[in-house]
């Protein structure tokens, strides 16, 4: 009898753990940031969870809309969770760093609560500036950038629209598990380790994309 009771309690505990997040709703809080940024400068992004939209424009300025997204049972319960996410913007002009900080991890439960916290970014940056981006879990969209790009994503999809194929010097896109698609030469590959590469000695722009699990899509911006 005691064994059966223990089994029922364990089953209920597991069921509660699985269903708990499903009962929560999403709440969000939006903040905006801006800083001067010059052509051919470098924007470095370090993000853990959340989607990232980046668009190039003809302005010497970096504008960021950061949406903190949390899962909670009510709006009141969501308010203290926003404080667990910190958006840090450092530097200006030639070098800018954007980071998302999470609460310190504990050794006995290193990922506790992280699934409830994310930051989505919408970014406008000089079209001829350079980008270095690292994201653990999230989708990335990049459009209208002519500078160098280095994109590393663990879990998610990356979509890049290339403004000018003539200016593209090199493209390397690789997924450890997933798919890679490009309309530059009609390439479409999937499975384990798909990759595509492109080289034009007269071009100027270099793009390097690496995804652990997900997809890479490279298109002409028409």
Regions found by a protein language model. Give the residues of each.
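Short acidic/polar N-terminal linker immediately downstream of export determinants
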Residues: 5-54, 69-77, 107-122, 185-203
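Short, surface-exposed interaction patches in beta-rich subdomains
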Residues: 28-38, 65, 143-144, 152-153, ...
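Repetitive beta-strand solenoid architecture
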Residues: 39, 48, 58, 92, ...
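Exposed beta-strand and adjacent loop surfaces of beta-rich binding modules
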Residues: 42, 61-63, 84, 130, ...
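Flexible glycine-/small-residue-rich
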Residues: 47, 66-68, 100-102, 125-127, ...
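Surface-exposed edge beta-strands and adjoining flexible/disordered loops or tails in beta-rich
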Residues: 60-62, 149-152
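Mid-chain, structured segments of secreted extracytoplasmic proteins
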Residues: 66-111
